[in-house]
Structure formats: C-alpha cells, structure tokens
A protein has these predicted regions:
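Hydrophobic alpha-helical segments within soluble ligand-binding/sensing domains
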Residues: 174-176, 181-211, 221, 255-263, ...
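Periplasmic-binding protein-like
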Residues: 138-147, 208-213, 267-278, 301-303
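Flexible loop/hinge segments that line or gate small-molecule binding clefts
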Residues: 146-195, 280, 306-317
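Short beta-strand elements in bilobed, periplasmic/extracellular small-molecule ligand-binding domains
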Residues: 107-118, 211, 227-258
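Short, solvent-exposed amphipathic alpha-helices that sit
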Residues: 11, 95-109, 193-196, 217-236, ...
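An alpha-beta-alpha
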Residues: 195-235, 347-360
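Flexible loop/turn connectors
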Residues: 263-371
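HTH-adjacent hinge/linker in prokaryotic transcriptional regulators
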Residues: 3-7, 21, 43-114
Length: 371
C-alpha cells in the first residue's frame, strides 16, 4: 500500500527526533523520497511548529540551537524587515494549530517572522524553548507556559517576571496579586463559552444539564462558567467531575468512569442534556449513547466544547467554538504593539467563543440569542 502524506510526515518526525538535527538531503535519503518532496514536507511541518528548518538543515523543535545556527536564524535573508517574534505552545495540532496560524498571519501582515517552539506540556522544555528563542534573537515572545491546570507556582510566576524581552501570555492566566500579572494577556473567554452552551440548552427547555470535562487548563474556566449560568437560571448543577492526570495525557478510562453515572441519570429521566469537553469525548459519548439505544437529539441533547470534530460526527454536534485564529492574531498584534512601545498600557484581552448550532440539540438557530 502506498504511503500517505500523513504517514510520511510521521516518519519524518520520528527520524528528525532521533537525530535531533540533520541536513535535508540526509533526511531525503533516509526517508527514501525525492529531495523536492522532503523539502515540501519540511516546510509544511515547520509552518505549524513541528520542525525547525534553517539553511538546508532541519531540527527537532526542542533541540538546542548551536551558536552558529542561532546567529543564522537571526540573520537569515528574508523579505520581512520587522522584529522577530517567538512563540512557545504545548502542541502544534488540535487547539493550537489555529492559534499558530493566526499568529503567523498577523506576523506576515506586519512584515515580520514567527519562530515556533513546542513543549509537549513539559515545563523543562518550556524553559528550554524560551531560552532557544531568546538566543535566536527573538524581540518578543508569545507564551503558553506548561503549568499545571491549577495555575503556576510562585517560582513559575517569578520566571515570567524576570523575562528580558516583551511577552504576551497566550491562553494562560497569572493569579491576581502574583508576579507576572503585569504581562499582556490574550485568550478565550472559556467561562462565558460554557455559560453560552448552558443558556442555549436551557432555552430549549432543559432544566437538568450535565457537565463532563477532561482535565485541562480550560477545565477551571468551563466549570466556573457552567456553575454561574446554572445559578443564574436557578437550575441544579449536575457536574460529573470527569478528568485525567494532566492536560494532553488525561486517560480515556478516567473520563469514561463518569459514563455509568450519566447513563443512570438519563435512564431515570432526570437529565436529558450535557455539555462535554473535549469534542473528541463528545463524539465518543455520542457513540456510547447510540450503543445504549439513546438517540441524539430525540432522547438526549449534546453540546461539545471545541469544534475540531463536532461537525463531522454521525449526528453533527452543536459546539462552542473558541476563535483560535483570532486569538493567535490578536496575541501577535498585541506583542508587536508592546515591542513598538514598551510603555503603552497593559492589556488583558478575552475573545468570546461562537456557538455553532447543528443537529445534536434538536434546534437550528443562527446564534446564541441570550436566552
């Protein structure tokens, strides 16, 4: 069977990770594809931060740049003449793919470059990537630190406060009163996104709405928004407290431990709607419900938080969709403003997600009407 592009990309990633750094010609020989094909693959993977490329070489994003390559990264010929931006995010796919694309679009529009480092939720790699980008000459940084979901430690806040270049926090918050709160911040209003879903379901007549969440940095805000909306509507909370050990590594079996509780509530007739994060879990829940003979939306209404897979589910899912591209774009623009004027007012920006109504709630509305 012929190897797909995705399979070849995975093989390229495995090879480069094993070597740390290598020439593109060497990579082409090891993969067994033409040099032109591998060059296109490397460009595509570098665009989303999964690889780093420089003057005929390719390296793993977490590999430390030697002094020569760091100088070349700063001095590389380019049509852009603006400041060099650095970006550190946990992963290049899923939520952050759109964020990276938005930041790249803003950088390109401003005539500047964006270098991306990936941490895979490792605090050690986060510190390494920040150092790499600063040594490469980054004039400012877009940062999504690899903190625990509960928030940063005091030491982690101090590290932010000691940064020697302008920085904008991306989809992260420093606790009020802590060091680092003076940094600019751009992110999604996840709490209001959860409340939006609750209001939509309540507007359709639901009075018992379950909440199933996987452990993530988004979880506290989603739980806060859900609880606030349920209280405002004077409805009882049905928070099933799903979760995993760490963002990006939450085990499916931990999340699915809550399914029997949800099933019992459905079968008793008490609960006929749920908000589920992530949309991958919402799609899995849809399949589990179908296996139990529970129809969506006839017997049960389902809203997913996030919109990566929701539209292509067997029953297209109503979803709350964070504006990832817009978040990345706004963060990059904010960083460019900070670099241009270090004394300008500090800004915290939160973008409201969108409610995309499909088939899984039994209603097709143009938008959340504030019910």
């Amino acid at each position: 069977m012929r190897e797909s592009v995705e399979q070849r990309h995975e093989r390229i990633l495995q090879i480069v990770r094993g070597h740390g750094s290598m020439r593109v010609t060497e990579l082409a020989a090891e993969v067994g594809s033409s040099l032109e094909t591998i060059r296109r693959d490397v460009i595509a993977l570098a665009e989303v931060g999964r690889l780093r490329r420089l003057h005929g070489k390719v390296s793993w994003p977490t590999a430390t740049l030697n002094a020569r390559d760091a100088r070349l990264a700063r001095r590389a010929p380019t049509a852009e003449s603006g400041p060099l931006l650095g970006m550190v995010v946990p992963v290049a796919g899923y939520f952050y793919q759109g964020v990276i694309q938005g930041a790249r679009a803003a950088a390109a529009a401003a005539g500047t470059r964006l270098l991306v480092g990936i941490t895979e939720y490792s605090s050690e790699r986060f510190a390494q990537q920040v150092g790499n980008l600063v040594r490469a000459g980054a004039d400012g940084l877009l940062l999504t630190p690899s903190w625990e979901p509960g928030g940063p430690t005091g030491a982690e806040c101090e590290e932010l406060a000691r940064l020697q270049v302008p920085a904008v926090l991306l989809e992260r918050r420093v606790p009020v009163g802590s060091l680092g709160t003076q940094l600019d911040r751009v992110g999604s209003d996840h709490a209001e996104g959860a409340a939006m879903a609750v209001r939509h379901l309540a507007g359709l007549g639901h009075r018992r709405i379950a909440l199933l969440l996987r452990a993530s940095h988004t979880e506290p805000a989603l739980r806060l928004g859900y609880a606030a909306a349920m209280r405002a509507l004077e409805l009882p909370e049905d928070d099933l407290r799903g979760g995993g050990a760490h963002p990006g590594t939450g085990r499916t079996e931990d999340f699915e431990e809550e399914f029997p509780r949800l099933l019992a509530l459905i079968q008793s007739g008490e609960v006929r709607a749920a908000l589920v994060h992530t949309d991958t879990d919402a799609v899995n829940l849809l399949q589990r419900l179908a296996a139990e003979g529970i129809r969506v939306p006839q017997d049960f209404a389902l809203v997913s938080y996030d919109d990566e897979l929701a539209a292509v589910a067997d029953v297209p899912l109503t979803a709350v969709a964070p504006l990832k591209h817009a978040v990345g774009e706004a963060a990059a623009n904010q960083l460019l403003l900070r670099i241009a004027d270090p004394a300008r007012q500090r800004t915290h920006i939160e973008l409201l997600p969108e409610l995309k109504v499909r088939d899984s709630c039994g209603a097709r509305l143009a938008s959340d009407r504030g019910l």
